[in-house]
A protein has these predicted regions:
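Catalytic domains of carbohydrate-active enzymes that cleave complex glycans
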Residues: 1-125
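Short, surface-exposed beta-strand/strand-loop-strand elements in extracellular ectodomains
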Residues: 194-206
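Disordered, acidic Ser/Thr/Pro-rich linker "stalks" and the adjacent N-terminal cap
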Residues: 112-180, 188-197
Length: 207
């Protein structure tokens, strides 16, 4: 954590640290250490369960980071989610964070939002033209976040784009005429961070 230079906040997310203490190399190291630990106590049920319980935060971090990575191995995520669901139930884990989100609800939501669905977005990869640019803290991901087919998470640092005290206005250029039946937009409501739902939304289409 200290070497990464990334501060750790009280309501933080693993996603904030995926280039720091939770980068791919270190995550691989952590995983290997837990593999060795489980192997070392494989014949002792009590100790094995302690290691498996201690591993849950790492598995949660793996799931959270995987859903923000385009092209990630969805089958691997599905298998890890099933194991995470099984273990949290086995060990009676009641909540995952300060917001008291139950593991069972998290797993249901993860399958619905972050694992492959039959429908594909016609706006995937579309060019974004900003009429009103997002706040500076969102701009590093803004050009991709709206059209990368990845849903945002439960906190504003997890793949969301935001504006403060003004309306959001932008154009999605699909590059060519396309036929579609509906327009959908996803929003975050996080009162603790003063992130609020819009009062209204208006869409315009052109041909």
């Amino acid at each position: 954590l200290l070497a990464s230079g990334q501060p750790l906040w009280i309501y933080d997310s693993p996603i904030s640290h995926k280039k720091g203490m939770l980068n791919p190399h270190l995550m691989k190291v952590y995983d290997e250490l837990f593999d060795k630990a489980e192997k070392a106590v494989a014949n002792d049920k009590v100790l094995l369960e302690r290691v498996q319980l201690s591993r849950l935060p790492l598995q949660y971090s793996q799931l959270e980071i995987a859903r923000t990575e385009a092209g990630s191995d969805k089958q691997k995520s599905r298998e890890l989610l099933e194991l995470f669901e099984q273990r949290t139930a086995q060990f009676g884990v009641k909540s995952l964070n300060e917001r008291n989100n139950p593991p069972a609800e998290y797993c249901v939501l993860y399958r619905k939002r972050f694992l492959p669905q039959n429908e594909k977005s016609l706006a995937a990869g579309a060019k974004v033209e900003w009429i009103s640019k997002p706040e500076a803290k969102y701009q590093t991901i803004a050009d991709e976040a709206l059209t990368d087919e990845l849903y945002g998470g439960t906190t504003y640092v997890e793949s969301w784009v935001g504006w403060e005290g003004r309306d959001a206005e932008f154009i999605l250029d699909l590059g060519e005429e396309k036929s579609f039946s509906r327009i959908e937009t996803d929003f975050l409501h996080q009162l603790g961070a003063w992130v609020l739902l819009p009062k209204s939304v208006t869409y315009f289409v052109s041909s």
